[in-house]
């Protein structure tokens, strides 16, 4: 029993000694960003906005992340141990705008069925023709176009950026028969850079739409009514 107690005490002293040594050799790094409202994280924990003091314990490393919507995320690991550069006293990060974000707009019309009631003074054939004309001015390839069932689907249009791949397509289907209406959906999805347009499992819905397509829903709505 005495041996067990002594062992526990020695282990506790050892832990305290190691912790003290780590804190004794700690380094402080004042991190700042070009964007004053960017969030700064240290090992996944938010530690400041725009500027923060990062503690790097002896014989350890810290991963710094800086994030702001519309900008590329910054990530860097700073180590305070042998074989690595000495942690700087200050570290300034210049954030770069996100090219995919700049080339797009946020909209509640993305990935949503928008019902468009057709003008009763126009025949269904005329409305279908107008619909196709509008869509083909934005999309080069239509995979399926069936007026009888009121279904149309374009092929994916892919646009790549340094940090992301964006694919966009249009889907049209019958909404109601009396009065006749179509449901129009602009599908917008995002994946990592250099992703094949066919890699469905790597894409997810995006609440933004590339500026190239920002007026397509409005055109369909205004010209078919």
Q: At which residue positions do the language-model features occur?
A:
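Bacterial N-terminal signal peptides
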Residues: 9-19
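Boundary at the C-terminal end of the N-terminal hydrophobic targeting segment
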Residues: 21-26
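Glycine- and small/acidic-residue-enriched microsegments that form turns, hinges, and capping elements
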Residues: 34-37, 68
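Short beta-strand segments within Ig-like beta-sandwich modules, predominantly Fibronectin type-III
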Residues: 44-49
